[in-house]
Amino acid sequence: MKTLYSLRRFYHVETLFNGTLALTGRDQETTGFAWWAGNARLINLSGKLLGAHVAHAGLIVFWAGAMNLFEVAHFVPEKPMYEQGLILLPHLATLGWGVGPGGEVIDTFPYFVSGVLHLISSAVLGFGGIYHALLGPETLEESFPFFGYVWKDRNKMTTILGIHLILLGIGAFLLVFKALYFGGIYDTWAPGGGDVRKITNLTLSPSILFGYLLKSPFGGEGWIVSVDDLEDIIGGHVWLGSICILGGIWHILTKPFAWARRALVWSGEAYLSYSLGALSVFGFIACCFVWFNNTAYPSEFYGPTGPEASQAQAFTFLVRDQRLGANVGSAQGPTGLGKYLMRSPTGEVIFGGETMRFWDLRAPWLEPLRGPNGLDLSRLKKDIQPWQERRSAEYMTHAPLGSLNSVGGVATEINAVNYVSPRSWLATSHFVLGFFLFVGHLWHAGRARAAAAGFEKGIDRDFEPVLSMTPLN
């Protein structure tokens, strides 16, 4: 494959480690791409492309650190996280840092440490990005063959894929180790309203874990989004981490099979399109996970899910009217169905009224009141605890509804509050980003397939607007 270096389009001669800041490799003459095409100019300059990626990582990590410290500086311990517009601290709290029983924040110092560590890391990445973008070798193949590559080199590409898979597997195991050995993680299902605990009894049964993948995505099934205990979540990360690491080793040691060499397009833009497609799928799955799952995304930090807020309202008024003497087991609503309680299509006792459509909700404040046939009437009469009442009243008034002007709550509610749930933000942003990543996947896949067939899709190079503009240099 070493012969491929001479086939590069727009390849130019360079002196290794040339200390100049010349604009070679960045203008249209030497790369075939105009300045606004961004990193396309660096397709065949592995050293410069490394600089762009490292600098980009630095920007990402800088944002994480700065935003983290910003949230710490504005944090008010007396209010729940989801009332304060926080999007990073809920993730740290979910990992068990700084919180105690009921999700109460008892120490903000770990959050401060996290922000500082990210800021320091971003400085290192930023320096590396600037070094490789401006001073380092333009191509890595000659001086550092291990880090060099040619996009057409199928064996090298699958080796790089393998390295990425191993890193992803290590990331999955970091969560496992945090949950098992380093202080545990927050469990919203811990008795009495949630607490941080170490996971001791991992679920490793493939029939249970892979059974989630075979579930229907609808209703009470809910595919993988229906997972509701941490043992399954952490056990799933053991499996995923192992599969990623073993798959990574396999991809490093093997060469692509003949069918894969024939079926796939082997170019930089093709790999970009594959990556965008995968990220798009991740975004859509994350959207559903954030919106519906209150185990991986505890309501104490992210606010209640939509179904949870609705069921909490039914529960709150059941408690109130029961105290006022209503017989909640037999009271009829305006439609002739039960006002407080009714039966689901499969016979369980569920909350009546409009919230009947959310009857498959599972939430830690409600489950203790269920029996073998749904909600247990005797428990509803005798066993409701003050913490359940407080939590449901809180969730009832913090439904994940809201608009861009930050007036949250039901649109017809005149006493709306200045609140938008982080659950809304996370779900919406991941859906929107997933959609745009999918469009990017289609665009780059089309261009890559066209290039492989010998022509080019996109803006006509002979008439693109940039040709009539003054060159940057």
Curated annotation (Swiss-Prot):
Pfam families from the UniProt entry: PSII (PF00421)
Binding residue positions for [CaMn4O5] cluster: E367
Residue intervals passing through the bilayer: 69-93, 134-155, 178-200, 255-275, 291-312, 447-471
Cofactor binding notes: Binds multiple chlorophylls and provides some of the ligands for the Ca-4Mn-5O cluster of the oxygen-evolving complex. It may also provide a ligand for a Cl- that is required for oxygen evolution. PSII binds additional chlorophylls, carotenoids and specific lipids.
GO biological process: photosynthetic electron transport in photosystem II
Main location: plastid
Record PTM N-acetylthreonine, positions in chain: T15
Membrane topology: Multi-pass membrane protein
GO cellular component: chloroplast thylakoid membrane; photosystem II
PTM annotation (Phosphothreonine): residues: T15
Cell location: Plastid, Chloroplast thylakoid membrane
Official protein name in the record: Photosystem II CP43 reaction center protein
